[in-house]
Amino acid sequence: MRIQQSALLLLLLAVTSQGDAESNWNDKIKVFTVATEPTDGYTRYIRSARVYDIEVTTLGLGEEWKGGDMQKPGGGFKLNLLREAIAPYKNEPETIILFTDSYDVIITTTLDEIFEKFKESGAKILFSAEKYCWPDKSLANDYPEVEGKASRFLNSGAFIGYAPQVFALLVDPIEDTADDQLYFTKIFLDETKRAKLGLKLDVQSRLFQNLHGAKNDVKLKVDLESNQGVLQNVDFMTTPSIIHGNGLSKVDLNAYGNYLARTFNGVCLLCQENLLDLEETNLPVISLALMVTQPVPFFDQFLEGIESLNYPKEKLHLLIYSNVAFHDDDIKSFVNKHAKEYATAKFALSTDELDERQGRQLALDKARLHQSDYIFFVDADAHIDDGEVLRELLRLNKQFVAPIFSKHKELWSNFWGALSEGGYYARSHDYVDIVKRELIGMFNVPHVTSIYLVKKTAFDAISFKHKEFDPDMAMCESLRNAGIFMYASNLRIFGHLVNADDFNTTVTRPDFYTLFSNEIDWTEKYIHPNYSLQLNESNKIQQPCPDVYWFQIVSDAFCDDLVAIMEAHNGWSDGSNNDNRLEGGYEAVPTRDIHMKQVGLERLYLKFLQMFVRPLQERAFTGYFHNPPRALMNFMVRYRPDEQPSLRPHHDSSTYTINIAMNRAGIDYQGGGCRFIRYNCSVTDTKKGWMLMHPGRLTHYHEGLLVTNGTRYIMISFIDP
C-alpha cells in the first residue's frame, strides 16, 4: 500500500513539475514583429495579440523602411532588426522566439496553445508553409516532397524556435534590401543546416496558416449566437493559431478578420473600442463633398438630407460637383440659399466640363487646401435619413468608414463583401446578412461607394485614376494597396440608396414616375404626412355628408407635379360626348380631362389605389374587400369658367369614387365643389391633397358646382365599376 502511495505521489510530483516547466516555457516565449508605421493592419495585429494577453515587441516603429518595395522581393531589413533584438537571448536554450509579420497577420489563440503546437512539431525552428515557391521558383524541385494537399514551401512571414537556434539562423549577414524569404529558403534547402538547426515546415497548417493559394483549403466557422469565428484548415482539420494574408490574399484575410480574435461576442466588440470623444468646442473640420455624377430622382430630398446633418456648418467646407445639367439649377439655388451658413461653399457644374475623376480630385484638393481633418463624400444617390450620421462615423475613429446604405427591398448596397479575380464585385458569405442587418457591426470590406468619411491621414493614398476602373473602384484599389482598411458600418440605419435606373429626365416631373423603383422616397414626397394616422381605428373619419368620407391622402408636391404633368401634356378633351379614348367612343357625362393612360401613369396610379386608397376604403366601408382595386377610369378634370365651369347631375359607374382636390379653393379658384343631391349636402371648402370618397352608383347622385373664377383641378377614379 505504501509503495502504491509513494508511486502515486511521485507521479503527481512529476505531473506538477512538468506543468510548471510548461508554464515556464510559456513565460519565456518572446514575440517579435517588425512595423515601421502603425498602419491599420498593424493596429489589427496588436489588437489580436492583446485580446489573448500576448505581449509583442515591435521593431522598427517610427523608423524608415529600408527593406525595399514590399510588393517585390526584399525584407532583409526585418532580419537585421530581429538579429539585434534577440542577441541577448542567444545563450538561453529555454527562451523561445516567435516572429511574425504584422500588417497582414492575425493571432487567434493564446501563447499556451501556440507553445503546445510548436512542441508537438518536434522542431527546433518551425516555419510557416505555403503553396507557392517564392521568390525563386526554380528552387521548387529542391524542396522535400509532401503528402496530398500539404503546403510544401517555406514562408518567412511567421516562425517560432528556440533562441539559440533562431540566432544561429540569422548569423549570416543579409543586405537590408535582400529577400528574407530567399535567405531562409536557402538555409532550409541545405540538408546539413536544416538538420543542425532542427528546421521544419508546418506543412499541415497546425500552427500557421498562409492564405495565398489556400482559399479552398480553409473555412471560416462562425458561432451563430456569439458571431465569434475560427478559421479551420479543412484538408487537415486543424485550427491554426496565426493567420497570414500573404501575397494576393489580403482581401481574404480582411474578410476572415471581421470574425477572428474576438471581434464579436454576441455584439460587435470592435465597434466599442478606441472611440473618438467629440468635444463640441473642438470639433474636426470637415470637407463636405457632394457628388452628382448621374441624373437621380428625388434630388430635392437628397439636399434636405444634407441640410439635416447635425454638425456645425461653420465647421463644414461645402463643395458640390455636378456633371449633370439636369441638376445644375437646383445646385445653384441650394448654394445661393445656404452659402453663408457654411465655412465655404462652392460648386462645379456641368458647364465646367470636369469628368467624375476630376470632380472627385477637385474635392480632395480642396480638402487639403482647407486643411480639413476629414472629407465626407456623399453621392446624390445616397439619401441621409438620420442627421447623426456624420457624428457617428467620426466616433468610430477610423481612417475610412462608411455607413451601409441599400436600395429599398433590394440587396443592392454601397459596399462589396468580396472581389472577383478581376477586381470586380463578388458576393461574400456574409453579404446578405449584413445588408439585411441580421448581422450588425463594422466590417472591413474591399469596396465602398456613394457615402464615406475619410481621415486626412489617408488623403495621400487616394488615387482616382485607373486604366479600367471607374473613380470609385480606383480609389478603393489605391486604399487597399496602401493598407488602409475600408470599414462599413450597419450599427444604425442612417439612410438608403435611391434607384436611378431608368430615371427618365425627358418627362415632366420625372420623380412622379418612380413609385415602383423608389417606393420610400415616392411615399415621403407624395403622400400626406398625416396619412398613416387615419389608419388608426381610434382616429375618427370626417364625414362632410352622409357616407361621404374625407381623407388627407396626398401632399402638395403630388398635386403640383401631377397638374404640371397634365398641363405639359395639354391633351385635354373637348368636353363633348364624343370620346375616342373610350370603348364605343361615347361619354354620357363628359368633362374636360386627361386620362392617366395618356401620360403613361395608368399602372402607377392603380398601384397608388392599392397601396394608399384601399386601406382607407376598408376603414370607411366596413366589410368591403377588393384587393387590388380595379379602375378603368382614372383622370384629371379641369374646370374653368370659359371652358367647362360645372358638371350636370349624374351617377358614377363605380362601386365607389374618389375625388382628390388638386389645388386650393378660394385661392386658385372661386366657386366649385360637389353637391350630393339626395342629401342636399355640398362640399365646397375642398382642401388641396384631401380626398372625398363616396359610393358611386345608386345612392350618391351628385353634380359639380359652378367655378366662377380661376382654374379648378380634381383627380377622379371610378373604382370597381
From Swiss-Prot:
Glycans are attached at residues 504, 530, 536, 680, 709. InterPro entries: Collagen_mod_GT25, IPNS-like_FE2OG_OXY, Nucleotide-diphossugar_trans, Oxoglu/Fe-dep_dioxygenase_dom, Pro_4_hyd_alph. 2-oxoglutarate binds at residue 712. The keyword Metal-binding applies. Its main location: endoplasmic reticulum. Keywords: Dioxygenase, Endoplasmic reticulum, Glycoprotein, Iron, Metal-binding, Oxidoreductase, Secreted, Signal, Vitamin C. Its cofactor is L-ascorbate; Fe(2+). PROSITE patterns: FE2OG_OXY. It is an enzyme of class 1 (oxidoreductase). Binds 1 Fe(2+) ion per subunit. Fe cation binds at residues 650, 652, 702. Residues 627-721 form the Fe2OG dioxygenase domain. GO terms for molecular function: iron ion binding; L-ascorbic acid binding; procollagen galactosyltransferase activity; procollagen glucosyltransferase activity; procollagen-lysine 5-dioxygenase activity. One of its GO terms (biological process) is protein O-linked glycosylation. It is found in: Endoplasmic reticulum; Secreted, Extracellular space. PANTHER family: PROCOLLAGEN-LYSINE,2-OXOGLUTARATE 5-DIOXYGENASE (PTHR10730:SF45), PROCOLLAGEN-LYSINE,2-OXOGLUTARATE 5-DIOXYGENASE/GLYCOSYLTRANSFERASE 25 FAMILY MEMBER (PTHR10730). Forms hydroxylysine residues in collagen type IV. Required for the secretion of collagen type IV (vkg) from haemocytes, fat body and follicle cells. This is Procollagen-lysine,2-oxoglutarate 5-dioxygenase. It comes from Drosophila melanogaster (Fruit fly).
